[in-house]
Amino acid sequence: MASGVTITLAIAIFALEINAQAPEPTPREEPSADALLPIDCRMSTWSQWSQCDPCLKQRFRSRSIEVFGQFQGKSCADALGDRQHCEPTQECEEVQENCGNDFQCETGRCIKRKLLCNGDNDCGDFSDESDCESDPRLPCRDRVVEESELGRTAGYGINILGMDPLGTPFDNEFYNGLCDRVRDGNTLTYYRKPWNVAFLAYETKADKNFRTENYEEQFEMFKTIVRDRTTSFNANLALKFTITEAPIKKVGVDEVSPEKNSSKPKDSSVDFQFSYFKKENFQRLSSYLSQTKKMFLHVKGMIQLGRFVMRNRGVMLTTTFLDDVKALPVSYEKGEYFGFLETYGTHYSSSGSLGGLYELIYVLDKASMKEKGVELSDVKRCLGFNLDVSLYTPLQTALEGPSLTANVNHSDCLKTGDGKVVNISRDHIIDDVISFIRGGTRKQAVLLKEKLLRGAKTIDVNDFINWASSLDDAPALISQKLSPIYNLIPLTMKDAYAKKQNMEKAIEDYVNEFSARKCYPCQNGGTAILLDGQCMCSCTIKFKGIACEISKQR
């Protein structure tokens, strides 16, 4: 991790005003007592099979979700699209790839002949380096440059419903024969900027303080987390993490798993999307929606390592992405286009910032806190969130990168009063800790998860320091400007216009298909939330139960 000047991360604690307003009532009727029985997912019947696509030699059908599972009924986790091999009755009008005077790679990619035998993998399969009579003419010659993880991550996709895309459309290991170098002022290291990235800057910034918010109403807390993870295009309280549509099946190619049909970094120990255990953590968080006497302490700290802007024309896309676009049917088939969106995302990042977001939610037991005389400020002091955390790069160690320091005194977890000693970390004050970190290596994420599984409740500033030290190896998108994924379809590709129109429609249908409007309404002003095919009710502060049907005043 990097910083050329001292950046102080002093944890300034403040309490937010609690918003206890009830959500707007739904115009639909509330469920009767019978409706509180488990409601299973209900889908429409399959459509008729489409005509046989003459080029893909497949036909398709689809269905829709009518009602999502609710009140502990079966979730909607089955595919909405289906495909079947068929024998076409029409001829396929194939377009022959023609690179003209350029070199055609074995992958079909066209590159300039000046890129042959330069030591770079310009074709993506090294076929441009396979027939060289002399030593390669290296673009960077004898200059020392390293591959940039920020550059590799730039442009990564976003799913409008919060899912992690499986692959990236951009080949950010293509340099077009250039040796554009970017200097990291903290480590004095030079990195090579990929061709697809028009602008890349190493700029380390960090929040001056950890941002802390506390919520007494579960819905407000959950709503904040959900909206942080979906885009502004998605106004529904709906999240989807599980892939339901099969990857695109290419003609003459056996069906592959999502992992094999995606572009990953060379280091398999680093998760390319850098958000770990997301579904599991949201399920844990949702389990508190109908519980009472809980308080939620939300802690966030952000570190930016750099900024990027992608080229808006002439980008080099991965062969896999282009093949998957070609494998889309010209007619609109919902399941096929949904599968494409779940592979690459609904949008890509045209510009943004890279780094990491450290985010934890502490679930506190209000009754236990009141009984033992523990205040919210006591909990924060126990966790070390009243300390200064300094991120600095001493001059004498600039070449070794930055370091973080903090001193957490765990005696601060002991509170005395009325002749009693309360250990905040052990005496049932902190019920749970849920992590939503973005960025950092999988190793650090696993270490944090193992610590939580052992029952540790004091995930503190020291854990933040360990995580932050791994950001250089695995940065994540922390802010971005989005562009629709269909803008990347090359205009010269056969049927490009039709497929672009289909994909635009698919994004709209995708949001409408997985909408909380297909949930039964909750009672007493509760709000329906859709989480991975299952509807749940988030109750106002005076009610509880799976449908908010029980008054807390009874």
Curated annotation (Swiss-Prot):
Membrane topology listed for this record: Multi-pass membrane protein
GO annotation, biological process: cell killing; complement activation; complement activation, alternative pathway; complement activation, classical pathway; innate immune response; killing of cells of another organism; protein homooligomerization
Glycan attachment points: N261, N409, N423
Domain EGF-like: 519-549
Entry keyword annotation includes Transmembrane: yes
Pfam families linked to this entry: Ldl_recept_a, MACPF
PTM annotation: Phosphorylation sites are present in the extracellular medium.
A Gene Ontology cellular-component term: extracellular space
Chain segments annotated as transmembrane: 233-240, 267-274, 376-383, 384-392
Protein purpose: Pore-forming component of the membrane attack complex (MAC), a multiprotein complex activated by the complement cascade, which inserts into a target cell membrane and forms a pore, leading to target cell membrane rupture and cell lysis. The MAC is initiated by proteolytic cleavage of C5 into complement C5b in response to the classical, alternative, lectin and GZMK complement pathways. The complement pathways consist in a cascade of proteins that leads to phagocytosis and breakdown of pathogens and signaling that strengthens the adaptive immune system.
Name of the molecule in the record: Complement component C9
Primary gene name: C9
